[in-house]
Amino acid sequence: MKKIVYILIATLLVTNFLSFTPSAEISDEQFTHAVFAEEFTATWCVYCPSAAENLMLIYEDVPGEPYYDDNFFFVALITDVNDKADERMGDFPDVTGYPTVIFDGNDEKVSGGQSSTENYEQAIDTTGQRDDTDISLEIEMNHLGNDKLDISIGMTWDEDGSFSNPTFNGYVRAYIVEKISRYNNYDGDPYHFGFLDYAFDQTVELEPREKQSLSTIWTGGDHQDKNGNDFSDIDYD
């Protein structure tokens, strides 16, 4: 039995945005939004464990290491064991090797193994300060027993529309992950936040100030990895 479906991460992405590049070290209190990173990796990749461990150092409250509280999350997309992870990598033609970490849908990208957290910190700081659309997200996940999860997302565009932009058109992805993955990296250690499946993966159109909700029942036994193994053994934490 795997300790897993620990976290559901949802991202609401827009195709057009303004970017901002910080000139000095910043506090995450200056962030306009939480930064989400997608780590493209493979179990056979020699340099991938360094990426995973440095991302985890940033995520966790480790003395002497950077910490962004609730303003940074990441998922490990292990492409050689998961078709949907492989397809997600295919969304980015400029992502051609392992490991590669993209931030907020490729707002920033860091490629190759990493000897420290420095390059990831810089990418997070830059991405976290970009001008962003004001969207409220409410995420709820309840265990229904066995391998069934009841998942819902509420989204509100907290801005007034304009004549040229009367609605907000975006894309929402909600990732079902294992905090301690069933898959091991090249060093034989479990991945952090290993991707299993999407709860939601779709376009959305939001009206100003109006809440829109999505809900689904996700069943682990209905989904498989590339080896034909399903996820009916999930354990909700």
Predicted regions and their residues:
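Secretory targeting signatures
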Residues: 1-28, 45
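Long, charge-rich boundary regions
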Residues: 2, 48, 95-99
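Generic detector of short, well-ordered, non-transmembrane alpha-helical segments enriched
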Residues: 8-9, 41, 97, 170
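Local sequence-structure signature of Cys/Sec-based thiol-disulfide redox active-site neighborhoods
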Residues: 26-72
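Short, conserved sequence motifs used for protein processing/export or organelle targeting and
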Residues: 32, 69-237
